[in-house]
């Protein structure tokens, strides 16, 4: 993401997982794990939406962690359709999470679906994520679970990969608000600064000393 990005591997259930970490300029105030879109459609941790979410996290004083799902980049294994990728995310979360810091979770498209699965798993274990953001959730393609009421859900009005209607159908039974970006497609072309602002605004109250 920048010259200071630190790259290493974490042991995962399918082998080595390629990880990238970006640090804030000041004191670390938490950890944000950002999950990338569908591997079979070219999704990687260097996707521009993923990097935007990571930059927003860093701006709030969070250590931003990205990684490649199994079979992507230098990560071992092969695409598993969701369950294996959730296991990958859980392995990275366990490796980078610090019990003394807030833990935030964000995902884009397929990564947002995996984020719902990981969030449910963490909650069941008694160690839920403190913040959750879902961008372009692939609700029409994968069975996303219910999420906490505090979750930020962002979708493009003209998304032709995952129709807005599919996300509204998922959100409706939960009475979950959805932030719709007018005119934005799935990849938020020309709207990435706004996307960064939306995440920063949603999470800023938890980090007031860095966001005021």
What are these regions (language model features)?
Residues 147, 152-155, 159:
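Short beta-strand/loop motif that positions the catalytic acidic residue
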Residues 107-115:
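Gly/Ala-rich beta-loop-alpha elbow adjacent to hydrolase catalytic centers
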Residues 157-162, 186-187:
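Acidic catalytic loop of the alpha/beta-hydrolase fold
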Residues 149, 163-171:
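Short alpha-helix in the alpha/beta-hydrolase fold that links the catalytic acid
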Residues 1-27:
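N-terminal cap/lid segment of alpha/beta-hydrolase-fold proteins
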Residues 79-98:
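Alpha/beta-hydrolase active-site loop
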Residues 184-196:
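Catalytic histidine-centered segment of alpha/beta-hydrolase-like enzymes
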Residues 25-66:
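Short, surface-exposed "cap/lid" segments of acyl-processing enzymes
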């Amino acid at each position: 993401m920048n010259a200071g990005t630190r790259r290493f591997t974490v042991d995962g259930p399918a082998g080595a997982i390629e990880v990238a970490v970006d640090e804030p300029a000041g004191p670390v105030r938490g950890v944000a794990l950002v999950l990338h879109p569908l591997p079979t459609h070219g999704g990687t941790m260097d996707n521009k939406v993923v990097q935007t979410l990571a930059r927003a996290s860093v701006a709030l004083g969070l250590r931003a962690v990205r990684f490649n799902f199994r079979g992507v980049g230098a990560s071992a294994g092969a695409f598993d359709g969701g369950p294996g990728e959730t296991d990958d995310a859980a392995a990275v979360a366990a490796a980078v999470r610090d019990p003394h810091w807030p833990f935030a979770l964000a995902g884009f498209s397929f990564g947002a679906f995996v984020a719902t699965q990981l969030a449910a798993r963490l909650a069941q274990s008694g160690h839920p994520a403190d913040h959750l953001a879902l961008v372009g959730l692939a609700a029409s393609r994968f069975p996303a679970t219910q999420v906490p009421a505090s979750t930020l859900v962002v979708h493009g009005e003209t998304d032709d990969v995952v129709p807005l209607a599919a996300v509204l159908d998922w959100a409706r039974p939960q009475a979950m608000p959805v932030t719709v970006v007018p005119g934005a497609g799935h990849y938020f072309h020309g709207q990435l600064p706004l996307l960064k602002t939306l995440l920063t605004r949603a999470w800023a109250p938890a980090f007031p000393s860095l966001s005021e």
